[in-house]
């Protein structure tokens, strides 16, 4: 019985080997490169050597034969992680990556894809190399590091595959297209004269728009935005104004990219579920003006600015926190997140909070390069675990005004004489104003009428009660 079982196992394995060999013959029976190759296509003869998708399998043994089973759960998880990484990679490449061509001996084209970054960002490039199984070595100086690949077969089987499915969304889209087409023609044996070679090399990155080719902004996604942020984003703090800011910059020739980011965020990112109702209503009321484009500076650079604290805290921060980061920019984000927490809780009005903000300011953005990051978790936790000063149900600006006027009145125990608080007939706070004038403008009446209804306590406009204090 055992003998026949072993024979069955042997015959099964031989069948699988023969079948696999037949598949490999079909797999490699390709002579031309496909210009419209889909991601994970088996049409490329070179993709067999690359592990673009991590596949999870395990084997089990029963009484008669070996059964090969696919671990679908882990496989799906790995596929999703890799998909998200590819989207991130494209966004990061749109900001910091390069597609370019060099001439060898003035007659041979060499194709390159890669990154040149600060030496402190080596860990990021190591992640990219490992995730792609990129057969490349680092080139390092005391200040910079490069990760570049020039193996045409590998580039076609991997980079072209990824960027065809998840396209660039800046003007680099045109550079990639010209780079890819030149590579495909080169792989298919097309010959060029010296003039054509120079023309191909010099026009890859000339920022020329191709009228018959539209950048597919509808392909924008969360991870592309994150990758682009890690390349081109900046998390700012303003100690003098006690606010945080966030921006993404780009040359004016890619202004449509910034407009597309703005449109995508406003249409797809929403306040988190536990956003206090008053704040949520105000966010939705001012939604379209929450993100602004600046005018070009003297160098032609435009910024997409996110400056409203409540919008940053209840919309931008939670979304970015939910995504997987790959670069050192995550340190900036975490420090910025801590700063946001300090401000939103009003802890910048304490000595410990103020000191921590100064420490963070010396370690964020460009200051983190060549710096010894020495802010311990205990210091941060010690501040964030303090009792909250601000009322979490109120917008940040209102809390700031309350604190400022309380300080002026030397009274830190209750809120007095601050702005206008608007309640419905059930004493539910529904909106706030920083003073009589903005309330009067909103309700289209005089500030004296606002003052009168606050003083006499009568119902305003048949449905509101106006107060100049916050009810418990």
Swiss-Prot record:
Coiled-coil intervals: none
Molecular-function GO terms, alphabetical: endonuclease activity
Q: Give the top-rank taxon of the lineage listed in the UniProt record for this protein.
A: Eukaryota
* InterPro entries tied to this protein: Homing_endonucl, Intron_nuc_1_rpt, LAGLIDADG_dom, LAGLIDADG_Endonuclease, NUMOD1
Q: Name one GO cellular component term.
A: mitochondrion
Q: What keywords is this UniProt entry annotated with?
A: Mitochondrion
* Predominant place of localization: mitochondrion
Quote the subcellular location field of this record.
Mitochondrion
Pfam families xref list: LAGLIDADG_1 (PF00961), NUMOD1 (PF07453)
Output this protein's name. Uncharacterized mitochondrial protein RF1
């Amino acid at each position: 019985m055992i003998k026949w079982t072993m024979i069955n196992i042997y015959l099964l394995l031989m069948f699988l080997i023969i079948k696999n060999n037949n598949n490999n013959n079909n797999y490699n029976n390709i002579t031309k490169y496909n210009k419209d190759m889909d991601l994970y296509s088996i049409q490329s003869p070179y993709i067999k050597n690359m592990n673009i998708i991590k596949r999870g399998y395990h084997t089990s043994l029963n009484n008669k034969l070996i059964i090969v089973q696919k671990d679908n759960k882990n496989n799906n998880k790995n596929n999703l992680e890799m998909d998200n990484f590819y989207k991130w990679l494209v966004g990061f490449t749109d900001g910091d990556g390069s597609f370019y061509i060099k001439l060898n001996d003035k007659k041979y084209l060499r194709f390159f894809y890669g990154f040149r970054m600060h030496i402190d960002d080596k860990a990021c490039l190591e992640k990219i190399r490992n995730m792609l199984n990129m057969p490349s070595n680092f080139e390092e100086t005391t200040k910079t590091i490069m990760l570049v690949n020039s193996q045409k077969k590998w580039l076609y089987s991997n980079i072209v595959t990824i960027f065809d499915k998840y396209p660039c969304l800046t003007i680099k889209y045109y550079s990639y297209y010209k780079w890819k087409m030149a590579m495909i023609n080169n792989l298919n044996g097309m010959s060029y004269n010296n003039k054509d070679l120079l023309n191909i090399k010099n026009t890859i990155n000339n920022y020329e728009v191709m009228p018959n080719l539209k950048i597919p902004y509808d392909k924008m996604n969360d991870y592309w935005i994150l990758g682009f942020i890690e390349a081109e984003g900046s998390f700012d703090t303003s100690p003098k104004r006690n606010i945080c800011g966030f921006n993404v910059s780009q040359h004016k020739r890619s202004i449509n990219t910034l407009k597309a980011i703005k449109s995508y965020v406003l249409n797809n990112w929403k306040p988190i579920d536990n956003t206090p109702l008053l704040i949520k209503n105000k966010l939705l009321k001012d939604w379209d003006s929450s993100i602004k484009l600046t005018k070009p500076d003297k160098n032609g650079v435009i910024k997409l600015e996110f400056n409203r604290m409540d919008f940053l805290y209840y919309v931008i921060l939670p979304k970015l926190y939910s995504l997987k980061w790959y670069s050192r920019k995550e340190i900036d984000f975490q420090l910025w997140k801590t700063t946001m927490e300090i401000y939103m809780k009003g802890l910048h009005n304490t000595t410990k909070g103020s000191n921590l903000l100064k420490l963070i300011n010396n370690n964020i953005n460009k200051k983190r390069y060549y710096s010894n990051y020495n802010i311990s978790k205990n210091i941060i936790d010690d501040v964030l675990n303090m009792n909250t000063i601000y009322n979490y149900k109120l917008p940040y600006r209102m809390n700031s005004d309350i604190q400022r006027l309380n300080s002026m009145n030397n009274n830190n125990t209750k809120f007095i004489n601050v702005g206008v608080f608007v309640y419905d007939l059930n004493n539910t706070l529904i909106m706030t104003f920083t003073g009589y004038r903005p309330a009067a403008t909103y309700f289209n009446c005089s500030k004296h009428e606002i003052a009168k209804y606050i003083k006499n306590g009568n119902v305003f406009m048949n449905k509101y009660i106006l107060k100049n204090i916050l009810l418990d």
